[in-house]
Amino acid sequence: MSITAERKQALIKDFGAKDGDTGSPEVQVAILTERITNLTGHFKSHHKDNHSRRGLLKLVSQRRSLLDYLKKKDEGRYKSLIERLGIRR
């Protein structure tokens, strides 16, 4: 369910401004999106797992907050990020 260290490093490299950039909103949103995608697949076969569903809702809320922050700071970066990630927002 969790993402591997290699996948996380690939996301950091793809979405970060420089190598090792883990704090930028783009990287954080990309990692959260990956985790949300994995959990969504988990619920296809474990539909009664309400404990993990609460965790999913927290992740979605955290991603929404980061996207709102990014939209407020720089709308161009926000639009390019949701296009790259395929988030319909």
Curated annotation (Swiss-Prot):
Source organism, top-level taxon: Bacteria
Sample GO molecular function, one term: structural constituent of ribosome
Keyword tags: Ribonucleoprotein, Ribosomal protein, RNA-binding, rRNA-binding
Extent of the signal sequence: none
InterPro entries: Ribosomal_uS15 (IPR000589), Ribosomal_uS15_bac-type (IPR005290), uS15_NS1_RNA-bd_sf (IPR009068)
GO biological process: translation
PROSITE patterns recorded: RIBOSOMAL_S15
Entry's Gene Ontology cellular component terms: cytosolic small ribosomal subunit
SMART domains hit by this protein: Ribosomal_S15 (SM01387)
NCBIfam families registered for this protein in UniProt: S15_bact
Family: Belongs to the universal ribosomal protein uS15 family.
Known function: One of the primary rRNA binding proteins, it binds directly to 16S rRNA where it helps nucleate assembly of the platform of the 30S subunit by binding and bridging several RNA helices of the 16S rRNA. Forms an intersubunit bridge (bridge B4) with the 23S rRNA of the 50S subunit in the ribosome.
UniProt-listed HAMAP family: Ribosomal_uS15_B (MF_01343_B)
Description of how the protein assembles with itself and partners: Part of the 30S ribosomal subunit. Forms a bridge to the 50S subunit in the 70S ribosome, contacting the 23S rRNA.
Protein name (record): Small ribosomal subunit protein uS15
Naturally occurring in which organism (per UniProt): Xanthobacter autotrophicus (strain ATCC BAA-1158 / Py2)
Gene: rpsO
